[in-house]
Amino acid sequence: MYSPESMNSNISSPSPPSSSSLNAPSLADAPEVRSDDGEAETSEPSTSVTAVPMEIVSQASTSAPVNQLLASGIDMSSVIKNNAVLQALLASASAGGFGDNAGLTMSKLLTAALANGSTAVAKRDAGSPRTDIPKKTRLKVFSNGFFMTFDKLSSCQKKYFWRCEYKNTCKARMHTDIVTEKILTFIHEHNHSAPIDEEVRLYGLDPTNIERNRVYIVGNVADPNQRRKIRKQVADREAAAKRLVQQQEEEQQKQQSASSIVAARAAYAQAMQNGSIPTSSGVASFLQSTSATAPMTSHSMLLAQMPFLNNIKTEMSNMVKNEQFTPERYTQHMSPNLPLQTATIAPLIIPTENYDSPSYRQPAIKRKATDLTNEEHDLRRDPMFQPTFELARKLRKLWKGEPNRYPRTTTTPTHHFEFFLSKNDGTDEHLYVPMRINLRDEAHLKEALQDFCGQQCIGMLLFGISPKISVMFNQPMLNNWDNNQFFLLDISNPSRWRLMYVDDQAV
C-alpha cells in the first residue's frame, strides 16, 4: 500500500553506476531481486560483495514507484497525455538518449508523476464541459415593503441581523428574534423607493396578501435580468415625472412674471394718461385687481418697470422709523400732479419740486440720539466695523509688552492704600472705581471689597496670580504695594474671592 514513508525510503539515491558491462551477475552471494512479474531470481551465495551491477539497481529503484502508481489508481495514460514534458522524455528514452542511466531517469520520472499525478489528472480538457462552483449567496427576506439580506448572528445568539439589499448605499438595518421570528428593531430608514408589485411577484409573493411586521423568506429565485429591467423602467418613469414637474414650475413662473410685467406697465400707462404718478396704495390695489389670478413674484422686476415705487417705499420706511407717519401727512407731502410739457419727452417723467417754496418744504427729520453705551448700538459688533476692531485688537496684543503678574512695589509705602477696582465680568473692557483703605491689612481690604460688591465674603480672600494659581493674602504683601494700581475682583465662587492684578502699563 502507498504511504509517504515507503515512498521516501524507496526513492533514495541509488549507488553510482559501475564501469563493468551489463552482464548476468557472477557473484557467489547475489541478493534476491523480485521483478515486475513476481518471479524471484536467486544467485549463488558468496562470501564477499565487491560491486552491484546497474541493472539490478535500476530494477529495484523502478519497481517501488510503479507499485505505488498502480496502488494509487492514477491513470498513467492521462498523465502522459496531458504532460508534454513526459512525452518528450519518453521519446528520448526510447531513442536511447539517456544512455546507461535509463532506469534511474525513469524512476525519477515515475516518482515525479506520482507526486503530481492528481494535479495532472484534475486538469480539464479543452473540449470537456465546465463544472462551475455554485456562488455563495445570502438568505433574502421581504418585510414591510423592502427586501433585506442576512448579515450575521448576534453575539448573544438570540437575534438575527438583517441589512438592506442595497447595502452599499442604504444604511437600513433590521433585528429579528431567532425563536419567535418577530421584528425587534428597525435602524435607519431606507433612502430609496420601495420595490413595486411586479418585483415582489418575481419572488413568488402576492403583494395583496402581505402582512405588515412579518418576515417572508424569498431566497434568490427571481430572475436578476428581469428585475433589472423593471428597476430601470421605474427609474425612467420617476425621472420623466420629475422633469415634467420641473417644466411645469418653470412655465408657471414665466407666466406669473409676464402677468406681473403686464400689470405694472398697465398701471404706469394709466398714471401717465391721468397726468400724475399714483401713490403706492393705489398702485398696489390696481396691481392686485389686475393680477388676481397670477400673484406677483418678482419685486425687482416690478421696481425696474416703476422706479418711483422704490423711492416711495424708502420714504415711508424712514417716516415709520421716525414715528412721523400718518396718512394725512403722507398725502400732504406727496409730489404734485405735473402736466406733460412736450410730446417728445421720455416716457418716464421725473417730477421736479421747488424746495425753496415754503409750501413744498419737507419737514425736518428728527433722529434719536444713539446711545453708545447700549449693547444694541455697539460699534464693535457692527458687521461693517467688526473686521477693523478685530485687526486693531490683534495688533494691540502684538505691540503691548508682557504683563506683570504682581503689583508694583515701593520702598516708601504709605499707611493707607489707594487702588482702582472693578468686577471681573469676562469682558475685555472694565470700568474701574477708586478705592481707599486706611490701614494695609486683610481685614480692612476685605471690608472695602464687601462694600464695593454689596455682598458678604463667607470664605477666604485670595490673590490670583494666574487663572489656576492663587495665594493667600499676608501682611508683607500689602505693605510693599504701590498706590494707584488696578485690580479685578472675581466673586463667581462665594466660598473664595479672588483679587487679580491688571498691569496698566502693558495694556
Swiss-Prot record:
Query: Zinc finger regions (FLYWCH-type), where?
Result: 135-192
Look up the signal peptide feature and give its range. Answer: none
Q: Name one GO molecular function term.
A: sequence-specific DNA binding
Give the observed phenotype of the deletion mutant: Knockout, in a flh-2 mutant background, causes poor coordination, egg-laying defects and dumpy appearance. Causes a ninefold to 10-fold decrease in lin-14 level in embryos and about 2-fold increase in the levels of micro-RNAs lin-4 and mir-241. Despite the increase in lin-4 expression, post-embryonic heterochronic defects are not observed. RNAi-mediated knockdown causes precocious embryonic expression of micro-RNA lin-4, exacerbated by simultaneous RNAi-mediated knockdown of flh-2.
- Pfam families tied to this protein: FLYWCH
Which processes are annotated in GO (biological process)?
A: negative regulation of DNA-templated transcription; nematode larval development
List every stretch annotated Disordered. Answer: 1-51
InterPro entries attached here?
A: FLYWCH-type_ZF, Znf_FLYWCH
Key words, A-Z: Developmental protein, Metal-binding, Zinc, Zinc-finger
Highest taxon above the source species: Eukaryota
Composition bias, kind Low complexity: at what positions?
1-26
Q: What does this protein do?
A: Probable transcription factor. Binds to the DNA sequence motif 5'-[AG]GGCGCCG-3' in the promoters of target genes, including micro-RNA genes, in order to repress expression, and acting redundantly with flh-2.
Cited PANTHER family: FLYWCH TRANSCRIPTION FACTOR 1 (PTHR37975:SF2), FLYWCH ZINC FINGER TRANSCRIPTION FACTOR HOMOLOG (PTHR37975)
According to UniProt, the name of this protein is FLYWCH transcription factor 1
Native organism is Caenorhabditis elegans
